[in-house]
Amino acid sequence: AVWGDYGQNLEKKPVGIYGITREGELRLLFEFPAGAVRHVHGFAPRLAGGWYIFTGDMEEMAGIYIASGDFSIVEPLAVGDQRFRAVRGYDTPEGLVYATDSSIIKNHVYLLPDEDPSSLRVLSETNGPCIYGTSCDAGYLFSTTVEPDERVRGMCSYFSTSVGPGVQTRETQLLLVNRAAEVREVSRLKKDIYPMKLMQYGSIQFASGQERRSDVVCFCRSLKGFDAMPVEMEVK
């Protein structure tokens, strides 16, 4: 298992990546220097071996890195832009398929080739930021999240129902990217009426280990008629 530091990191401290050995020992595998990234969003295994690393949040700190299997080598692939702010991604023979997680601009599903990041390709627009996804028999699922407006501060932010600029509708959108990199919408579920910061963001989350399944198990949170409900859906 590998994971990275995630927090506000207002002091712009170094950000570590950690792993557990087979003997159960915790190790620091790599450390981004102070000010390089705010935190680590996630990882995706590469078909060629090693990892993609997703970091956030703002401009120069948002990026996608390539790491060797033991994290002895970590190099930037595409950094310094909200187009490279991601949490979930999946490697394919054509490149990395990922959805952006920006609360301040319109979000998209992209295809990013390793050999030529300048050939970044838009596969689809989404209605909001994406932090959840899973692979399944039909391809790759991404779900968007109904997030609050981060410009609302203090105690008022806990009761605000205003959404961020990157959230286009008050719905969680479920998108499928098939093996041919074609995108279609599977479903949309409406956010409930309650404030997001106090009562959770509207989201669809996924169980792990569904790579070969066509019936996908997910968990709905803060969605009208589906709050705190596990759901099984057929995805073809």
Q: Would you name each region that the model predicts?
A:
Residues 27-33, 73-79, 119-123, 187:
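A short beta-strand motif characteristic of beta-propeller blades
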Residues 10-18, 59-66, 104-112, 149-175, ...:
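Structural motif
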Residues 1-3, 49-53, 94-97, 139-142, ...:
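Entry beta-strands of beta-propeller and related beta-repeat scaffolds
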Residues 33-79:
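Loop-centered beta-sheet repeat module
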Residues 36-42, 81-93, 124-139, 193-209:
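Repeated scaffold domains used in trafficking and secretory/extracellular systems
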Residues 21-25, 68-71, 113-116, 179-181:
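Short loop/turn segments that connect beta-strands within beta-propeller blades
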Residues 201-236:
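Blade-level signature of beta-propeller repeat domains, shared across WD40, Kelch, NHL, RCC1
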Residues 1-24, 29:
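Recognizes the extracellular SEMA beta-propeller fold with strongest preference
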